[in-house]
């Protein structure tokens, strides 16, 4: 039974997910359904966390919208995500960047990775 579940999960994994880490800035193109219309909404922000593995893997993206911090958690292999673009690669020394929640303005900048 265990291997049957693994085979089903392996079939659901996406192959078009780029390599990204916490500190990277992403454009996440999300399919949004409003009534009977669907459209693509871009959520641009910094990855502050990536956790889980396999089909259960998720990542959290943080952005500042109208002076309010907004965090959104996405499943990596979700069919709702059209595509993920890596805008820039950040250089950080932590796996979880929760400390960014307390920083404002220039203090919240992340150095570019070469």
Curated annotation (Swiss-Prot):
Pfam families: Ribosomal_L19. One of its GO terms (molecular function) is structural constituent of ribosome. Transmembrane segments: none annotated. One of its GO terms (cellular component) is cytosolic large ribosomal subunit. Keywords: Ribonucleoprotein, Ribosomal protein. The keyword Amino-acid biosynthesis does not apply. InterPro entries: Ribosomal_bL19, Ribosomal_bL19_CS, Ribosomal_bL19_sf, Translation_prot_SH3-like_sf. One of its GO terms (biological process) is translation. Belongs to the bacterial ribosomal protein bL19 family. PANTHER family: LARGE RIBOSOMAL SUBUNIT PROTEIN BL19M (PTHR15680:SF9), RIBOSOMAL PROTEIN L19 (PTHR15680). This protein is located at the 30S-50S ribosomal subunit interface and may play a role in the structure and function of the aminoacyl-tRNA binding site. This is Large ribosomal subunit protein bL19. It comes from Thermobifida fusca (strain YX). The gene is rplS.
